[in-house]
Amino acid sequence: MASVRNNRLIKFIPGIFFLLFGCAPVATSLPKGTEYDLSARDTLEKFIKAHHIKDTFKAVARIEINADGKKYPIKVAMMLKRPSFMRIESIPVIGLPDLFLSANNDTLKIFLPKENEFYLGRPSRENFSLFFPVNLSPADVLSIMMGIPPLPDVKLRWKESVEGEKLRADFFSDDKKILTLLMDGNNGRLKEIVILASDGEILHTVNYDDYCQVENIDLPQKITILSKGKNSTIVVRYSDMEFSKEENEALFDLPIPVGVRPIIMDRGSSPHRQGS
C-alpha cells in the first residue's frame, strides 16, 4: 500500500522548507580551530534572532521533485512556525487543492481530496516518509526549511574551521559527527547543511542560494535538498515571503472533513482506516 501511495502522492509532495538565516554570523564569533560544548538551543540562538523565531513564516513555493527518474512540479502555500507547527496546501492551476497537510508536536495530518483520503498519525520520520521522498521528521523538515540545522536537544561538541572562503562548523554527539554547516566567510550566510548517520554516511545535503532581504533578514529564495537514501532531489523556490504574528495555533491544525474516516498511520506496517 505504501508503494502505491508513494507513486500517487509524489506529485503532491510539499516543499519542505523555509529559512531564517541572516543571523548566521555564529562562525565569526569563534576562534578558528577551537572546540566548545553547547546545547542545541545555544547553537540555534547563534543562527537566529530570538524575536524572529516567534513569528510565522508565510510563502508561496514552487517545488520540483526529482525521484524515480521522474520530475514532479507543484506549487504550494505554506505557514511555518517554530518549533513544529506546519500548514501546507497545494495551489492548483484550476480547481481545488490536491493536498492539505498540517503538523505539530503530536500529530501529522494529510488530506488528499481527490482520493477522499485523510491520514492521521504521529509526526515521525516513518510516517512522513510514507508520502515524501525524505527520511526526515516533519520537525526536521521545518527546521531545514527555516535554515535551522535539525540538531537533537542534547549536549553537542562544536568544532570550527576554515574551508577555502567558507567557514565550516562540525557538530559531534558522543564523538560522532552528525552534522556539518558551511557558511559564507564574507557575510556569514548559511550555504550548506550536511546531515550524517552515526557511521559517517551522508544522509542529506541541503544547499541555500539566491538570498534576498525580508524585514532586514537575509533569506535564501532557493533551497535544494539531496536525499541519498531516497535517491531524490527537491528544489524549492520561494516568492511572496513574509513574517506575521499568528497567535492562534488552531490555524495549524487540519480538521477531519465530515464523512471521511481517518486512516491511522501508526497501526502495524501499513495505515489502517479508523475502526477497521
Language-model-derived ranges and their functions:
Residues 62-66, 93-95, 110, 213, ...:
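Hydrophobic lipid-interacting interfaces of membrane-associated proteins
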Residues 55-63, 74-80, 84-90, 99-101, ...:
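One face of beta-strands
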Residues 49-57, 69-72, 79-84, 186, ...:
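Edge/loop elements at the starts and ends of beta-strands within beta-rich repeat scaffolds
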Residues 59, 88-89, 108, 141, ...:
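Buried hydrophobic packing residues in well-ordered domains
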Residues 157-259, 263-264:
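Gly/Pro-enriched, hydrophobic low-complexity segments
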Residues 85-139:
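An acidic-aromatic
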Residues 1-23:
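Sec-dependent bacterial lipoprotein signal peptides
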Residues 23-73, 256, 266-276:
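N-terminal leader/targeting segments and the immediate start of mature chains
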